[in-house]
């Protein structure tokens, strides 16, 4: 099989069905799904298991709660050539995996990510993601490639070689992974299409102005010193997993 789709969850009963339904409709079928749960107290497990007869599916209880730990645990239990990390609240088009696979067939790529689009009609949300796409992905990649954790596709051998996500990093772990892969000589690609459709629930909780400021501050730290960027921002940004 080609892809192992890894999804960390924590109390995602309202959202997880969205991405799992999208996966059911994919035109490209060569994949398994590995959901790693951080001891949800809602009906996340029940929602996930509704799809157990739709495609190869593993639902695993994580020994430890944390988005990076859960992603790494999913990767350890994955068996395919490429790992795809999705957040539990994203949506994708029916031909998303087909387009990703076509790109991988044409080029020898170790890590791949895409532009994102908000699941929202609000102009401010479009602006925030335009900023993320153009500034934090397109422009910054000239200094050092980055990735947004809502979708990362990475060759499993490459991921394993660098030790996966750093589990003590609670903000910026996605950019950290991309940087360490790049620094180790692995190849990178950023696609404008197909886009991942991303929930704006964090915007609703934290406030849009706060999210803009947070991203600007993070980008400033990165541009000042990409080598120590991750270590410098730890503790400076509140970014909780599963707190919605």
For the regions a language model picked out, list residue spans one by one.
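Short, well-formed alpha-helical segments that are part of the catalytic scaffolds
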Residues: 12-25
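A conserved acidic beta->alpha catalytic loop
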Residues: 37-46, 64, 90
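Acidic donor-binding/catalytic loop of UDP-sugar-dependent glycosyltransferases
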Residues: 43, 88-102, 179
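Glycine-rich, basic loop-to-helix element that forms the pyrophosphate-binding segment
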Residues: 62-78
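Short aromatic/hydrophobic "clamp" motif used to bind/position activated sugar donors
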Residues: 83
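Conserved donor NDP-sugar-binding/catalytic core segment of glycosyltransferases
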Residues: 95-124
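Short, flexible, basic/aromatic active-site loop/helix in glycosyltransferases
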Residues: 113-150
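Acidic donor-binding loop at a coil-to-helix junction in glycosyltransferase catalytic cores
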Residues: 171-177
């Amino acid at each position: 099989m080609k892809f192992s789709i890894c999804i960390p969850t924590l109390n995602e009963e309202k959202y997880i069905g969205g991405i799992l339904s999208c996966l059911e409709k994919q035109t490209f079928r060569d994949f398994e799904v590995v959901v790693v749960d951080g001891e949800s107290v809602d009906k996340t497990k029940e929602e996930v298991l509704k799809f157990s007869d739709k495609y190869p599916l593993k639902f695993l209880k994580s020994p430890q709660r944390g988005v990076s730990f859960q992603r790494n645990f999913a990767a350890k239990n994955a068996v395919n050539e490429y790992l795809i990390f999705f957040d539990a609240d994203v949506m994708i088009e029916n031909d998303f995996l087909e387009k990703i696979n076509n790109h991988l067939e044409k080029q020898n790529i170790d890590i791949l990510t895409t532009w994102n689009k908000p699941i929202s009609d609000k102009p401010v949300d479009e602006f925030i993601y335009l900023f993320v796409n153009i500034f934090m992905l397109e422009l910054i990649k000239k200094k050092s490639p980055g990735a947004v954790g809502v979708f990362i596709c990475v060759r499993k051998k490459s991921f394993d070689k660098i030790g996966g996500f750093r589990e003590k990093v609670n903000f910026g772990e996605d950019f950290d992974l991309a940087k360490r892969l790049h620094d180790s000589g692995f190849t990178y690609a950023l696609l404008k299409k197909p886009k991942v459709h991303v929930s704006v629930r964090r915007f609703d909780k934290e406030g849009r102005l706060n999210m803009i400021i947070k991203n600007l501050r993070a980008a400033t730290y990165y541009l000042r010193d990409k080598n120590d960027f991750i270590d410098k921002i730890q503790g400076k940004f509140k970014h909780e997993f599963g707190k919605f």
